[in-house]
Amino acid sequence: MAIERVRQHLESRGWDGEILEFAESSATVELAAEMVGTEPARIAKTLGFSDPDSPERAILVVAAGDVKVNGGRFKRRFGGKPRMLRGDEVPALTGYPIGGVCPFANPEGARVFLDESIRRFESVFPAAGTATSAVEIRIAELPELTGAEGWVDVTVGWAAT
């Protein structure tokens, strides 16, 4: 099960928090914010793109819930226009279904990046592998827990506080 895979991944890296599971969908930023009781911006959406250098790989960008990816910034950082993964590509390239994509325990080859938009928070809530789960993670722990390749600045619609 996806949640168990996420739990094992996080615990193997020293995390000891709780995965939140819901009776109803938390697949959108608004639904997730309502379920966890926070503002939408603190929902960390994991956006899946085709890697311009290697289309059979995913680039996963963990961004705040109130932002949009800027095509020019993405192209400057990754060398090609952003192309969201198609529905049939999502499970194969991310390891999770649409609505449950998260930056933990992804298939080999998936590249995870953390967007600057989430640094304004002490913690954020990414999905935990299903459309009915979330997990609160401190920003300071995200690089280690995700195995991210680094921080990027590819979004617009927010301002540092």
Regions of interest found by a model, annotated:
Residues M1-T161:
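Extended, low-hydrophobicity, polar/charged segments
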